[in-house]
């Protein structure tokens, strides 16, 4: 499956659930306490991160989505710290603050990147009036593309059925990271993301792939779900739907340092990708890739679009296809992190011929990645006159993207790609024809950035205009 990143910034993600504050105390250990047989940690660094549902929202925001977080907290210092953390990453929070409860806080003591102890400060919100949070959900739903229910069993989601019903009535998909064995409360959700332990706690021990799929389908039917995504640690993840073959995605992690928050990354990437327009299969593939990245980090962490692009666009792959400008910028950043040389060219490419193919092949040999910027239909008409282009923008870009020499294809609406070139700033800008380098659009911007501009020769005897003329004469 060839995947490109969606425009995550268009996604509006509503996260509702058990919010937490994760605290980390880091320091060396060099002796045993004289008071008890335990190591003494000299705390040198204190760190705070959003946890639980807050980490889910943080992951969506890290991808570029507009994230809104709803949950229950206390009226305490930890709630203020959590709100400050979320404001810093531009997550809109609307908490129900309760005087008689502490904000759920987990304090971890670490030495040499090894966790020695965890202290939990919490009291489950089981007796809280569910209408307090439901009112905020109803206000947020009209401004959301997807809703995530992040259930850690702490009491914020004590009326899940009503939340699912309201969201589905509004046409908004609901993705649930479940907790416990009572899946009845998730009836009617779009998709559940249990891990293997949670799945087997509901259906019993699974002994084969066939049994996994069969029992997964039973859950899909029984609880009126659209899909079930079972995350299986080192065995990847499996998407199960009624009427379609299962989709198995192998694990992507190269090294596993910490699985803390990996489930949060999976559901947030999945939901954000769906909200940004990706299919369920594509969204699951992106979530699987994100999970492989995040388990290589210590503690609850996030994945950026550049990291995701870097993992998707490996050195061996090519032909990633048509992209928007936003997607292209992320892909270029990822390429540069890998030390790759980015080459860029542009043109109408109305009727692709041997001259074009030869030119693009030569351009591609000059670097590691080749970007082709293509004039839109309106731009071509202004430059070439009535009757052009023969092929619309989408078809021209699709043909170019299929060429082995071409990595990324992007449209531009202006007469020249100068603005786009200034945004991308390729290492090498090439153009075919009889130009002088300084006459080429984007020359000043590229050279000022330390890049190079080069003119390549076109193959003689190949011309789109001549091809069109010949067709008309013979027609």
From Swiss-Prot:
The active site is at residue 264. Residues 1-318 are annotated as: Ribokinase. It comes from the Bacteria. One of its GO terms (cellular component) is cytosol. Pfam families: CTP_transf_like, PfkB. ATP binds at residues 195-198. It is an enzyme of class 2 (transferase). Residues 344-475 are annotated as: Cytidylyltransferase. Keywords: ATP-binding, Carbohydrate metabolism, Kinase, Multifunctional enzyme, Nucleotide-binding, Nucleotidyltransferase, Transferase. GO terms for biological process: ADP-L-glycero-beta-D-manno-heptose biosynthetic process. CDD domains: RfaE_like. GO terms for molecular function: ATP binding; heptose 7-phosphate kinase activity; heptose-1-phosphate adenylyltransferase activity; phosphotransferase activity, alcohol group as acceptor. PANTHER family: BIFUNCTIONAL PROTEIN HLDE (PTHR46969:SF1). Homodimer. In the N-terminal section; belongs to the carbohydrate kinase PfkB family. In the C-terminal section; belongs to the cytidylyltransferase family. This is Bifunctional protein HldE. The lineage of its organism: Bacteria, Pseudomonadati, Pseudomonadota, Gammaproteobacteria, Aeromonadales. The gene is hldE.
